[in-house]
Amino acid sequence: MPLTTKPLSLKINAALFDVDGTIIISQPAIAAFWRDFGKDKPYFDAEHVIHISHGWRTYDAIAKFAPDFADEEYVNKLEGEIPEKYGEHSIEVPGAVKLCNALNALPKEKWAVATSGTRDMAKKWFDILKIKRPEYFITANDVKQGKPHPEPYLKGRNGLGFPINEQDPSKSKVVVFEDAPAGIAAGKAAGCKIVGIATTFDLDFLKEKGCDIIVKNHESIRVGEYNAETDEVELIFDDYLYAKDDLLKW
């Protein structure tokens, strides 16, 4: 049975965040990029790529659908230009800036970013939103395998000092904030609980993909106290669309 308790409090060791669709609604900007990219390529179905590739690294999408252009330096340049060329289409996911600022205000680093975007693009999104970047800011340039492979989220949790603890999972409680199937799969494979953000896909889809708790956006989430003894920080969900009942036992 799903939970109905509100507010819901979770004590966690670390939080990992996707960027596109999770912190910033950049999908319209990225869609505009793909349409421009495909204008002189008759074989390239931009609408199909837009539909299927959310959460992928741009390099992986180009390697699959336009392999002649799969050059890392070229792709990095293209993606790095997206915020300047198409940034007017992008806005904060409601509540994201406030939530990130609250995490930044904690006495210890408790959050990281793991995005499929390139470092240049992701840094520019943070600059646009005026969010201080966390120490562990993992991008497409920092991994050999992108989402849905767990490498990005494993790097994030390991960097923060909370690798998977199979003997005692309660000593390494990490949540992933995600909006896309590839990222949800990556987070689950990295041993994390998933906070689904219903910006890109609807409630039923996110439930089907296995999210543990689903929210409309970040406005209903607060950062509570940090406990130095347990090295846990409290996340308080004043409202949510769905939550699994096993969260109470986590």
Curated annotation (Swiss-Prot):
Localization terms from the record: Cytoplasm; Nucleus
Top-level division of the source organism's lineage: Eukaryota
Binding site for Mg(2+): 18, 20, 179
Expression induction or repression: In response to both anaerobic and osmotic stress. Expression seems to be under the control of YIG1.
EC number: 3.1.3.21
Primary location group: cytoplasm
UniProt similarity note: Belongs to the HAD-like hydrolase superfamily. DOG/GPP family.
Quaternary state and interactors: Monomer.
Protein name, per record: Glycerol-1-phosphate phosphohydrolase 1
